[in-house]
Amino acid sequence: MLDKQFKKETFKKSVKENVKFLYRKTLEEATQEQIFQAVSYTVKDVIIDHWLESQKAFNEQDPKIVYYMSMEFLMGRALGNNLLNLGAYDEVREALEELGLDINVIEDQEPDPALGNGGLGRLAACFLDSLSTLNYCAYGCGIRYHYGMFKQKIKDGYQIEVPDNWLKNGYPFEMKRPEYAKEVHFGGHVEVGWDPVKRENTFNHVGYQSVLAVPYDMPILGYDNKVVNTLRIWDAEPIVDFGLDSFDKGDYKKAVEQENLARNIVEVLYPNDNHYAGKELRLKQQYFFVSASLQEAVEKYKKNHDDIMKLSDKVVFQMNDTHPTVAVAELMRILMDQEGLGWDQAWAVTSKCVAYTNHTIMSEALEKWPVELFSRLLPRIYQIIEEINRRFIEQVQQKYPGNYEKIRKMAIIYDGQVKMAHLAIVAGFSVNGVARLHTEILKNQELKDFYEMFPEKFNNKTNGITQRRFLLHGNQLLANWITEHIGPDWITDLSQLNKLTVYADDEKALQEFMNIKFRNKQRLAKYILEHNGVEVDPHSIFDVQVKRLHEYKRQLLNILHVIYLYNDLKMHPEKDFYPRTFIFGAKASAGYHTAKKIIKLINSVADVVNNDPSIQGKIKVVFIENYRVSNAEMIFAAADVSEQICTASKEASGTGNMKFMLNGAPTIGTMDGANVEIVEEVGEENAFMFGMSSDQIINYERNGGYDPNFIYNIDTEIRQVLIQLINGTFSSDTELFRDLYDSLLTTKVSDRADRYFILGDFRSYADAQKRVEEAYKDQKRWAKMAFLNTAKSGKFSSDRTIEEYVKDIWHLDKVIVDKSKTRK
């Protein structure tokens, strides 16, 4: 329903006025990018009214607030999503058409805000969407990165990282809020004194460098309920203006020192930490946004509440992974050094306010900091962590007298390292995993000692995705079809999709469903032709793997299987082979050389396969450059097959698997993460599962016995595929892929051969791929499988996940902004 403020004539007039006001141009003279800005400011004007109404309701109703703290928020484009949530998309599209403008072209002008990279950031974005839609009060807390992680270019098959300058034209949906700026301190030292009245030590942090954290707010709209929450991202500015006096005297270095300190903190997401300076910068980033966010939260609480001891009644901090876990010590610092609480009081408050989400089973991803770095950069924070550690070790000794192995495994500070996950578990009142299997592995393997000591803290919250972004916005053809058949309630209650099952044997419905899939494939094929120069057949099977490039996600297994299929087709050209298009999209971290080499291999295989006339275009390989939310929406809608092939026990949950499922793509995957729960919902007959179980993998890792060389020696086809990596088939430089070849077969001091069991799962994967082909050839059977994946995806909404967080962890109250739009 069109918001009353979106009268078409008023809207058109406002767009023209904004073009004139912003650019001194008429609509006819303006560029498409300028028109995007003008349209966005028109929409923002309406959003701000709702934002103000929401703030008024929050102030009057005084609800408990969740501060969702995350290094990443991968929001995606805002214009179209905001229009859908306002209920004004169709009317605005018509208004723009009357001005001679195409809403799709205008939406394409918007840069993806470069505030995240992978699933961690996209989950945070989905959660904010659900919190607003479900009428809860929330703040997202993060960093306003000027250049994101990087913009990926592919040159000669290699990933090239260039700055993602998403702010170069200004971003219309953010608002600078300098009046809420906070000071953050680094370095210096702590002077310990004595308070004779309180008869206790005092701690005074002196000699520090300061940075000003300046907030920028982005509105997070609920769907059709007028609730607007806030994503608050912090930019860094120097405390003092540029030192012109120093500059005039020739001391340029001193003059720009403050400027550089601030700028470096917010320049990029995840600076390369292969070296000391990179590690220091990452720790600075984490403390910077955590300190600013906590200062703001405590200040906000104190405006309306007198008793700081009751902070947990109104505030909860959810730490998304280990990056924000320094929040534990920072909250203690604020409560003791600024609010005057004693240790026991501060601990009582902190341990009721902070909760931790674990996102990884892989121990190397659980952050640790060198004591030397941590204590130098954050001396007061380190002191507090030392004391938390001392008291915790006393607890462990009481529970397990004389068990020094327990202390070694559980200590927060040990062997010159500060272990952030341990800090979060010890201090937090809740520790959650993000899929049922993941949580069980945490409890029984990785965090077993902590689970035995604090079983009441551990719980599972299986991840989810927002259907409003990944179906309503990303696949409007399918969304409209679903609404025509079961009504619109699924938009805010995804379990309603189960009503579609009555159409699972309806030939007309299935044909319409597959026609929509084909139209989405045509749209993606057009994008691939425009961006890759590769012509792909929308009648072929679109087999898609899009996610961060990491060895455990096994893009290498996928491309080795493509080589295997290519060899088979070359050997048996007469074979009845159903055409396949293998689509990859992934960024590799700038310092992750193996991952970057896998990207090069994918592109080298594509060069050979796509240009071999003897296979008649039956296999195509495409690597989509600069994978991000805006092209992801198009990819999910077009996929036939969802590749979820990580090594079992390594993927905490995954959410791409849910997005593919929602859009009607059956999964080929291992029984890991949320794949397990997807198969439970849709049935094994509607998925293609393969590979070793997580128990088998964990057993091999603990006890040995896995030998990839044995597989290499007895399986001639696998051996041929690997030899082709080093015999010039895919590069005239026979050493180019030698390190990938060696990683699969050669055990080194630091790493065993084939760490992620690629050869061990290869045959099982190839067999599953054969089952995919056989199923797809039977189009009636495939249509039903694909359709049931959509119909059975109701569990995987982030709305369901958020309600579980609210019930079990956060204990929030719903806020009513528009009484006619209150959700139960």
Question: For each of these PLM feature ranges, what is it?
Answer:
Residues 1-824:
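A conserved ligand/cofactor-binding region detector
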